């Protein structure tokens, strides 16, 4: 997943349509920030009358009046600060929400090979960290630019009005600072991209340990995982230091340049021609205080570049992800009243990460209501066949047809609606049992239909023992259930769909012997109405299949019924002999 090298302007132009619906909030916030800056500058400008009139002439009445003015200005400053903070938080929250929704939706439609090549930790970082970084960095930069920019302009106006002779020197440092900021812009963006990548790696490493903590404990892998995490976190630290160094160098340079301006003001104040211009103690205090006050916004404006570049770098990463092509769905066939005639014709397929084909010139047919079992050693290509039927992957050569129509001509939603899959890797959601069985279609099925599917999968045996029955929340990925119970819910989910094609990818592998026997009885009833592909490790579960295909290195080595294959005295009999004797 490569990031496009776009300029900051191009990136912001693309981000603007997401922000623009909330521009009223930005305008209100901008006005409030300007008022806030004017209030700050106003407080400094009050120093001249306070010193010259109030204290210099000991005017008690004037001092009393100024006390009310100071309270009013500070009150105005507080109100404007609240309004600007609230409006910007509202806009930022909206932008983060939209970005996260777009990324989440886009990821749901990405093809399976994309997830093979990108870790879930890295993708989670895109949804959480990068989306937040775009909004926070952009809003933070806006606050700095508008508020500090308005503050500097206000201070300049106060200085010029008070004593333009002392103030004129300040204009000399502006172009120098602008050149410096432009010089470091590109570097900040590059470093920020590296930080985002490191964050993705850090998240991925931590996620692997958390998901596989039982394996870590079982094999004593704590030291290995600690070293792996330490390496990734140290890499992130070093990249963070590079950003800190770039930031630390730019700030002192700006401040040194500004210090020369301050020194010049002090020196010019001693020049008689300037002192003759009615320069009072109040005037000098206002000019000098304004220049001191200007150091903070100048520093902030220097930092805003780094802050803004972080957001733009994150934005480029997210747009690069959004630009990736989603799953191809060019088919138009609706697939209504599918009978279930499935055919593989000279199918060859190779995974992107491998050189050797997973399937080679594979051909076989499955008639309606028939069961074909696929057996073979791990890595022979059995599960690949199941993935091709549902178009999780597309064939390189040949074709797969359903009812005589190429599956690529079907709409993806229609094809998958007609193919129910139960794999050895069961995934359940943190929801009720009923909603997991009727996943993505809970309004389509009645309570009675859900119960029937659960009974047919022999899941009601344990569901009825739970305190809340079908309404029991099972935790993330069914953490509160046993492996066999989770597998039965997955089978119930597939049965409820009542699809004409049923794919069982070692679906009974996690069941105990008694449960497996019950499931086999249920599946035998269903096989008369469905086209079934069974991928099995235990040969005892597929002895009654209409045809058994022995897959080896992506090719069909043997085919026939259970008895026919035993009579061949070949690979199937060897597998059978090994399992019987164990």
From Swiss-Prot:
Its main location: membrane. GO terms for molecular function: ABC-type oligopeptide transporter activity; ATP binding; ATP hydrolysis activity; ATPase-coupled lipid transmembrane transporter activity. It is found in: Cell inner membrane. Keywords: ATP-binding, Cell inner membrane, Cell membrane, Lipid transport, Membrane, Nucleotide-binding, Translocase, Transmembrane, Transmembrane helix, Transport. SMART domains: AAA. It holds the Pfam family ABC_tran. Residues 27-310 form the ABC transmembrane type-1 domain. It comes from the Bacteria. It is an enzyme of class 7 (translocase). One of its GO terms (cellular component) is plasma membrane. PROSITE patterns: ABC_TM1F, ABC_TRANSPORTER_1, ABC_TRANSPORTER_2, MSBA. ATP binds at residues 376-383. Its EC number is 7.5.2.6. CDD domains: ABC_6TM_MsbA_like, ABCC_MsbA. The keyword ATP-binding applies. It is a multi-pass membrane protein. Homodimer. In MsbA the ATP-binding domain (NBD) and the transmembrane domain (TMD) are fused. Involved in lipopolysaccharide (LPS) biosynthesis. Translocates lipid A-core from the inner to the outer leaflet of the inner membrane. Transmembrane domains (TMD) form a pore in the inner membrane and the ATP-binding domain (NBD) is responsible for energy generation. Belongs to the ABC transporter superfamily. Lipid exporter (TC 3.A.1.106) family. This is ATP-dependent lipid A-core flippase. The gene is msbA.
